C-alpha cells in the first residue's frame, strides 16, 4: 500500500539537482546555496565518482534531505535487495523504474524505512515521437497516468513525472500519492533537452508535492538568489491552492 506523502516543510519542496562529477564540487554547491536549499537530488554522474555515499552522509550530517535518483531497474529479487540496503541510509526519496509491476511490488515490500519510493514514468526529455520510436504510439500523458496507477497498485509511494502531467496524475491517484516534478523552468523554456516543462506555480497548482530544479539555479548569476526566488514562488503557490 502506498504511504502518505512526506511531511515536507515549504522550503523542502524545492529539490536541487546536484548534477556534479565529484564530492568536492557537490559540497561546494551545498556551501554556496546555504539555507536557500534544504533538499538535494544526487544521481548517476556522482555515482561514477565513487564518492556517492560520502556525499549522502555529508548531506545528512548537514540536516539536508536526500533524494537518491538512480532509477533502479532489474529483476524483482535484485531490485528489492538494493532497496532493502538503501533503506538503511538517511534517504527521503529514491527512484525505481515504473515499467515492471512485479519489481515495483518487490521494492515496496523491501522498503523498511520512511524513504518514499518514486516510480519513473516517462522522462521529461521525451515526447510522443520518442515514445513512438519505442513502439508506444500514445500521448505521454496517457502513458504517465497508466504507469502512475500501476505504481500505486504495486504499493509504490509516488511518481516522478513532468509537471504537465501533475494534474491528470492527481486526479487519477488522489491526495495520498506523492508527485515530484523535474524539468521545472521558472522563467519559461530555455532551449535545453527538457521537452515537457512547466513553471513553478503551475506544478503546485496542479498537485505537485515537490519540484526538482537544476540548471535554472546552477546557471544563474546568483544561484542562491535564484533558489530564494523559487522558494518565494513555491510559498505563494501553496498559499493559493
From Swiss-Prot:
Cystines in this chain: none
Signal peptide: none
Coiled coil: none
Gene Ontology molecular function, alphabetical: orotidine-5'-phosphate decarboxylase activity
Keywords: Decarboxylase, Lyase, Pyrimidine biosynthesis
Presence of keyword Repressor: no
SMART domains on file: OMPdecase
NAD is among the record's keywords: no
EC number(s) on file: 4.1.1.23
Reaction(s) catalysed (UniProt annotation): orotidine 5'-phosphate + H(+) = UMP + CO2
The protein's annotated pathway: Pyrimidine metabolism; UMP biosynthesis via de novo pathway; UMP from orotate: step 2/2
Designated name of the protein: Orotidine 5'-phosphate decarboxylase
Source species: Stenotrophomonas maltophilia (strain K279a)
